[in-house]
Every structure is written in structure tokens, then in C-alpha cells.
């Protein structure tokens, strides 16, 4: 199946919800990395995943467009619904999932191609037949990097600074017209000025896309997100590892100013993490 549209499913699902995680447990071999996650990610908002290292937040993020399929031994129980359709259903094409739900990684990773082709290449292989020049410009503008790139579109993407490369990667993701954009610590390798540009870009992008971001920077979560999910991890009984779990999911203002769980209060106040 190469489409995620199933009329019988989309009739009943909540259109305000972009992604619905229902009792999701993700394992690597016999090790449960994160378990029993229930979460509804709202459409047209920025949702932040926060928590200490090893709590499973990036694992959950990558499950939202099946990037974890590329990791040997990784498996998922439960369901993730997108438009009322289970992304892990037996007839779902993972490539189509990744077109509809794009991802931007921690380290900028432009293609070894020109700036122009970084945008055009993915659109072309996904069947885009419109005005490519217009698409390239529109995508670069949406990612707030057009002014830096417009006079050197034929130069290598590697000629850009780190922050510009990351915005180029965002533009590349936008070009294939996804509905959701996942961002896995997109600013962790960037300087403060580049980070600010990415954050400003996110505020504009949420007018057109649903965004889910993993960040270790709690101030960033406060600045950019509408909703925040706090993950934590606990030691496995009788084992040596830790299993991640979702502690609390709420409006960002409530998570940081009036959390319902003591563990959330301890984390956002800097008592651990």
C-alpha cells in the first residue's frame, strides 16, 4: 500500500490530532527501551520531547516515521495512528510514511550536491512535476535561508555554515511537502545565533506543518513549543539497563510552571537530568 489514506479510518479520527500513540513499547532485541506510551500530538503545533539522556525520547521520535525500522532488532508494540491509519499496519509502505512525516537530524547532513539539487533531488524522485525553480525558492524561503543561498544555488551545500546547512536540510524536508516535521535535537551542534534562526524558523513553519522536536535544552522547549512531553527512565528490575516512559504530557506552560508530577517538577527545576 503506497497511500496512508483509508476513508473508513479517516471518517472517525480526531482531525485536531496529527499523531496518536497508543500503548507504544519499543524494544531493541529483548531490551525494552521505552514502554507504554500514550500520547496525542496536536496538529499545527510544536510539541517538544524533553527528559534526561536514555529516557527514550529520540527513540519515540524516530518511531513516528519508522526510522527505527532501519535499526536491526528494533520492534514496536502498540500502534501509532496518522490520519486514523496505523503506521505500522502490514500494508503500509515505510517510504511513503517518511515522505509524509519528514525528519531533520541532530547533525546537518546536506547531500553532496549543489544547494539547488539538495532541494530538487528529493522532490524529483517523489514525482514532483511542477516548476522546480519556484519550489526551490519557496522551500528555501520557508526555511529562512533563501537570502544566504539565492546567489549561489549551484554551489555545494557544504559551502554553507553549520546553521545554514541545517536550514538547508529543513528546506529539503519541506520540499517533499510532508504534513509533519520531526526534529531530533536540531540545534545541539549550532552556535547561539544559528540556534535563534532555527527557532524563529520553527515559529513560521508551524503555520503550515506539525512539528515534533527532541531537545535537551529546556529553555528552548519553553521558547518554541506549545506542548511538552516529559520522559524519564527507571532501572529495570533485576537488570542493568533503564526503560524509558512518558511521565507527563501537557501544555508547555503547565509543564514548566504547574506540573502535575513530582518527577516533572524535579526535572524542570534542575534537580536531576
UniProtKB/Swiss-Prot annotation:
Q: Its GO CC terms? A: plasma membrane
Give the reaction(s) catalysed.
phosphate(out) + ATP + H2O = ADP + 2 phosphate(in) + H(+)
What Enzyme Commission number(s) apply to this enzyme? Answer: 7.3.2.1
UniProt keyword terms in alphabetical order: ATP-binding, Cell inner membrane, Cell membrane, Membrane, Nucleotide-binding, Phosphate transport, Translocase, Transport
- Every ABC transporter domain range: 19-258
Membrane topology annotation: Peripheral membrane protein
Endpoints of the signal sequence? none
SUPFAM superfamilies in the cross-refs: P-loop containing nucleoside triphosphate hydrolases
GO process annotations (BP): phosphate ion transmembrane transport
InterPro entries listed in its UniProt record: AAA+_ATPase, ABC_transporter-like_ATP-bd, ABC_transporter-like_CS, P-loop_NTPase, PstB-like
Q: Where does ATP bind?
A: 51-58
EC class of the enzyme, as a word: translocase
A single GO molecular-function term is: ATPase-coupled phosphate ion transmembrane transporter activity
Tell me where in or outside the cell this protein is found.
Cell inner membrane
Q: What is its main location?
A: membrane
Q: What does this protein do?
A: Part of the ABC transporter complex PstSACB involved in phosphate import. Responsible for energy coupling to the transport system.
Give the multimer and partner information. Answer: The complex is composed of two ATP-binding proteins (PstB), two transmembrane proteins (PstC and PstA) and a solute-binding protein (PstS).
Name this protein carries in UniProt:
Phosphate import ATP-binding protein PstB
Amino acid at each position: 500500500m503506497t497511500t496512508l489514506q483509508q476513508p473508513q479510518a479517516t471518517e472517525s479520527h480526531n482531525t485536531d490530532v496529527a499523531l496518536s500513540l497508543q500503548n507504544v513499547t519499543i524494544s531493541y532485541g529483548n531490551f525494552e527501551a521505552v514502554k507504554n506510551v500514550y500520547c496525542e500530538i496536536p496538529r499545527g503545533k510544536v510539541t517538544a520531547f524533553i527528559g534526561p539522556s536514555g529516557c527514550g525520547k529520540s527513540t519515540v521520535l524516530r518511531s513516528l516515521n519508522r526510522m527505527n525500522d532501519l535499526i536491526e532488532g528494533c520492534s514496536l508494540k502498540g500502534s501509532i495512528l496518522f490520519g486514523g491509519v496505523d503506521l505500522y499496519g502490514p500494508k503500509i509502505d515505510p517510504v511513503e510514511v517518511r515522505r509524509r512525516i519528514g525528519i531533520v537530524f541532530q547533525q546537518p547532513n546536506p547531500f553532496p550536491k549543489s544547494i539547488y539539487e539538495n532541494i530538487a533531488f528529493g522532490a524529483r524522485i517523489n514525482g514532483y512535476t511542477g516548476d522546480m525553480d519556484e519550489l526551490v525558492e519557496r522551500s528555501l524561503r520557508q526555511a529562512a535561508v533563501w537570502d544566504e543561498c539565492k546567489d549561489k544555488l549551484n554551489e555545494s551545500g557544504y559551502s554553507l555554515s553549520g546553521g545554514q546547512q541545517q536550514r538547508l536540510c529543513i528546506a529539503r524536508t519541506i520540499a517533499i511537502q510532508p504534513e509533519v516535521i520531526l526534529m531530533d535535537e536540531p540545534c545541539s551542534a549550532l552556535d547561539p545565533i544559528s540556534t535563534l534562526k532555527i527557532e524563529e524558523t520553527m515559529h513560521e513553519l508551524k503555520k503550515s506543518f506539525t512539528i515534533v522536536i527532541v531537545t535537551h535544552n529546556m529553555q528552548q522547549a519553553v521558547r518554541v513549543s506549545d506542548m511538552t512531553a516529559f520522559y524519564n527512565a527507571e532501572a529495570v528490575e533485576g537488570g542493568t539497563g533503564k526503560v524509558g516512559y512518558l511521565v507527563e504530557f501537557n501544555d508547555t506552560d503547565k509543564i514548566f510552571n504547574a506540573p502535575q508530577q513530582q518527577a516533572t517538577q524535579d526535572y524542570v527545576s534542575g534537580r536531576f537530568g
